[in-house]
Amino acid sequence: MLIHVLGTAQDGGYPQIGCNEACCNLAWENPEFKKYPSSLAVVDESKKKYWIFDITPEVKSQLHLLSAFECSLSGIFITHAHIGHYMGLINLGLEVMNLEEIPVYIMPRMKDFIMGNTLLNQLVENNNINLIPLEADQEVYINNLLSVEAYNVPHRNELSETVGYKIIGKGKTAIYLPDIDSWKNFENKLRSLIDTNDILYIDGTFYDKTEISSRDVSKIPHPEIKETIKMLSDLSPADRKKIHFIHFNHTNDAIRYKSKIHERILDNGFSISRENQQFIIS
């Protein structure tokens, strides 16, 4: 069983709609540099199944990345109600895939959000999806090789709560934490997660908030990568390597391979998520 990275960008992907600045022109002019919104898959080849963590607007292309496994979609875990993390659900209904009873694992407010949204609730009424309630800090057993545990994360919770996920295989464990407002009041939890897990995919939205000039960054809070690196500078080299930044904004040079920022992060001993990376957990 393995984790397969399906996307590494912020909700809008890379390049981002409406952006004609230098940061995005590279990808407009060279489609090979395109990046999908953040998402992971857990693939169980022995049972011919996979589960995805967040279902993005680019899910069509992301699931195609898994076609070589010849496995079927068997469940979806959603972190929160921001568009890059749930909007792919609309592809499961009558107009596109018309799937049947796909388990969608969600927290209580996220369930209320789906049930209260006419478009999404139609998926429930038509039995395309089956909403499976989660509780924070309660392990859910998917099969004899895989279990998952949700934990609450401080983030902009306008429409739902936000969670991260612990993915537990037979041999190794991983953390998926693409969105958080700040490490304030969460640093001890983060350090505990680093101590007790093998790989962590954590919020790398901005390297430095000065990269945003056209928006009020106070309204889109995320920790800066440079501050995360500083905060975790006391980690051992082995623990630093566990940290894989993910969820990069289009303005963040970490998303651009071999950029100075990309290399600076690696030089500090941390890792950068890449699409199609794999990590064995069982």
Residue ranges: model-predicted function:
Residues 109-119:
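A short, active-site helix/loop in glycosyltransferases that binds the activated sugar's phosphate group
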Residues 10, 83, 111, 207, ...:
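Residue-level marker for beta-strand->alpha-helix junctions and adjacent short loops that shape enzyme
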Residues 1-66, 133-193, 278-282:
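Core dinuclear metal-dependent hydrolase active-site scaffold
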Residues 48-52, 56-105:
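Active-site metal-binding motif and surrounding structural segment of the metallo-beta-lactamase
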Residues 77, 102-111, 201, 244-246:
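Short internal beta-strands
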Residues 71, 84, 100, 127, ...:
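Structured loop/turn residues at beta-strand edges in well-structured enzyme cores
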Residues 2, 101-103, 130, 147, ...:
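Residues at the starts of beta-strands that form the adenosine-phosphate
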Residues 171-173, 180-277:
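Cap/insert and terminal regions of metallo-dependent hydrolase folds
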